[in-house]
Amino acid sequence: MSHLKSKTAVITGASRGIGAATARHFAAEGANVVLAARTTAEIEAIAEEIRGAGGAAAAIACDVSRYEDVEAVMVLADTAFGGVDFLINNAGVIDPISHLETSDPDGWAQAIDINVKGVYYGLRAALPRMKAAGAGVVVNISSGAATSALEGWSHYNASKAAVLSITRTADKELGDSPGRSVGLSPGTVATEMQVLIKASGINPVSQLDPSVHIPTDWPARAIGWLCGPDAAEYRGDDVSLRDEDIRRRVGLID
């Protein structure tokens, strides 16, 4: 993926799962990566691993529900690497899984703060920089839950529906500029989130056999592809990694 070489990617939720895999993939393709997450020790370790392999990486603690934290991430990208070319809005939570009538109002609100405000704050901080630079790609991690409600996931369903709308709005506002916004619905991925889902025992997703979950490398590679010119036709859209045609275009299957 030559389009990633020497470019700079900001990745939120980069301490584990899809975020960590994306940081490693982008770095392996020659990109500078800025890892952001609440757990500093984990992202520092990944950044050190990348640097040890000859890559360029920086890490910074960030709570995406706080705009000042997100702005600080962009400032680090500016100072360390000269700007931001790609923003991967990956940070998100699925806790607390609960039926509406027994849900915790504070936990529900916190999930919205992270899953929705976090995406908005990332866009708010990155778009002025991308517009000034004349290019840039934002990939927002979406979900089939945006359009297909699942029991016990009212907070997650609502937040991912909001992310889908924000993705489309951002792309409309980018207009005919080289910049674009796109969503990726990865499907079920072998991450810690699936452990929480299975433990809940609520809705059909919790009953899935772990063998059906795709590895984190798949969405990481799909995100890399979405940042390139071959995926420009999907701007403003929500791309599903369940689609075999998409998997072929990414190079995941023959």
Residue ranges and their predicted role:
Residues G179-G187, T191, S200-R249:
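C-terminal helical subdomain
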Residues S15-R16:
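Conserved glycine-rich cofactor-binding loop
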Residues L123, S159:
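Active-site helix of classical SDR
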Residues S143:
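Residue(s) in the substrate-gating loop at a strand-loop-helix junction
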